[in-house]
Amino acid sequence: MYIHSSRTVLARYGSRTPLLRPSVLGRYSTSPAATIEARKIALNRDNYIKSVYDRIAKIPPENYRNFSIVAHVDHGKSTLSDRLLELTGVIQPGDKNQVLDRLDVERERGITVKAQTCTMIFNDPRNGQDYLLHLVDTPGHVDFRAEVSRSYASCGGALLLVDATQGVQAQTVANFYLAYSMGLKLIPIINKIDLDAADIPRAMDQVESTFELDRENCLQVSAKTGLNVKSILPAIVDHIPAPDCDINSPLKALLVDSWHDPYVGVVMLLYVKEGTIKKGMKLLSAHTEGRYEVKEVGIMYPDKVPMESIRAGQVGYIVPGMKDPSQAKIGDTFFQYGKHEGLEALPGFEEPKPMVFVGAFPAEGSEFKVMDDHIANLVLNDRSVTLEKETSNALGLGWRLGFLGSLHASVFQERLENEYGAKIILTAPTVPYKIVYKDGTDKIVTNPDEFPGSDLRNQNVDKLMEPYVNAIMTIPDEYIGAVMSLCENNRGIQKELEYLTNGQVLMRYEIPLAQLVEDFFGKLKGCTKGYASLDYEDAGYKKSDIVKMELCVNGEPQDALTQVMHRSQVQARGKEYVVRFKEYLRFQLFEVAIQAKVNNKVVARETIKAKRKDVTQKLHAADISRRKKLLSRQKEGKKQMKASGRVHINHEAYQAFLRRTI
């Protein structure tokens, strides 16, 4: 029987009135009355958890339904999740909004960054049976595609959510094809029907024409008001298949996510494909061959709720007592140690591939060690970030971080500042370039400093290649000319142009990834007055005429400001950089030259004139020879100072310049 002592439950869940979610216990009174009340609360909570466990234990696997929500950014995924949690009794109506958006940055930006999960129990009034529903609230932005794909692996179907005011958008299309390719059963839902700007017939027509789904099967709801949301739960039961699983087979579990808990360490979220996981069981990793003992097992309801076990078809969490957080590799398969002989790992394990790299340095050099720990904790919670230590002559010790996209980098920086109060300097984003040598070997370069310089022949380089992406854009047809010009100015190649219903156009372009990370989306929004949407996927490498541009101050290259770009951009970008960097440098007692160099050739230059003292101030106007002598001596001194002097550039100058560059 599943029973905790009241002290254990009180310490875990706290002294708040027992609703449906555990909460953290703060300081409470130790008076006899308060102690009795706390014991009552703990007992009630314990009884409630037991009742949940008993209900789940009675539900057969054929009544399990694992599903996700497919949607564009800001189409209402998290709000719809809240309504479903309310209808199934997981949270109370009127409780805090966006329960599954737990990060501050998610609430502030109105986006989902980390895929969150929750178990629900739905009693179908049509037959009186209980159904175990497992919801995954996935990110909608393209940068977090890795979160989406691994979440779909644990699902049998998905809700295809379309905003009635905006219609089908680029990320809806991209996520649809990802879900469709993984065999998910899709239920089309038209959201935000309560708004005056809602055009329901248009949205239904787009669903039918773009996705070939019957418009008559579209459910019309308002997640904000709860209108008609009740119709979604029976549709999930009827149309999404039960997971293909076997409780009696040896254990196979897929690692869906992991995060760091300050009290218990690494927590792993697993989809149990076959078998059962129980407390005390020893697990074996298929990819790292590490062995771990299950310290705790349970479900997300929506916070952690301990259980005796989780069975095939369920998604739950375990505390494995893992000492090295890097061993938690997303997509890994876990077996029961001792019963793993002859078993094959589940498909889908793939190391995340960063698309954008930045150098990161503490604003204060003395904070490196503390910030190193903070970054390590964040990387554990977001395994798609790659981390290497690096050193800059200008900024000192730092890290080279790899991200899935520019928004991903921005969100990581914001989380670091919000959650740890850390101040960090990020260099301009760069993409991974490929250097192909004459002997047939190749090398991926993510740091501009490592990019080959002027003499490629002496370095045995055959060709240089840069990554391209297939960009999908949906825009109103009135902006088609402006968007085509934008794409061509960013070295884009048109692949497809399709007119959708009601004045929308779907455009596909092949664009260099380097152009995409330079605020391409911001420019796209600007030229379409905010009505455009964008998604993209990797299109491989292509040969390109790319060069390294160095920013030099008095001949000294500033490694933190080195960039790689296409040769056609060198003149304009070089002039812009030297003019802007000049703004942040202080006057010196000698002349300072700021130069942009490519292959040791100066392509742009700005000069900061020397500060000079008026050495002739005390002279009589008629003393010409003395005047010339003093000016000549001053000029000679300036020459010597320029030859031996070094320009001190403080961190604030780099920070201000890079802030505007990014």
From Swiss-Prot:
One of its GO terms (biological process) is positive regulation of translation. It catalyses: GTP + H2O = GDP + phosphate + H(+). Pfam families: EFG_C, GTP_EFTU, GTP_EFTU_D2, LepA_C. One of its GO terms (molecular function) is mitochondrial ribosome binding. InterPro entries: EF-4, EFG_III/V, EFG_V-like, EFTu-like_2, LepA_C_sf, LepA_CTD, LepA_IV, P-loop_NTPase. PROSITE patterns: G_TR_1 (PS00301), G_TR_2 (PS51722). Keywords: GTP-binding, Hydrolase, Membrane, Mitochondrion, Mitochondrion inner membrane, Nucleotide-binding, Protein biosynthesis, Transit peptide. The keyword Cell division does not apply. Residues 1-28 form a transit peptide. GTP binds at residues 71-78, 137-141, 191-194. SUPFAM superfamilies: EF-G C-terminal domain-like, P-loop containing nucleoside triphosphate hydrolases, Translation proteins. It is a peripheral membrane protein. One of its GO terms (cellular component) is mitochondrial inner membrane. The keyword Nucleus does not apply. Residues 62-244 form the tr-type G domain. It comes from the Eukaryota. It is found in: Mitochondrion inner membrane. Promotes mitochondrial protein synthesis. May act as a fidelity factor of the translation reaction, by catalyzing a one-codon backward translocation of tRNAs on improperly translocated ribosomes. Binds to mitochondrial ribosomes in a GTP-dependent manner. This is Translation factor GUF1, mitochondrial. It comes from Meyerozyma guilliermondii (strain ATCC 6260 / CBS 566 / DSM 6381 / JCM 1539 / NBRC 10279 / NRRL Y-324).
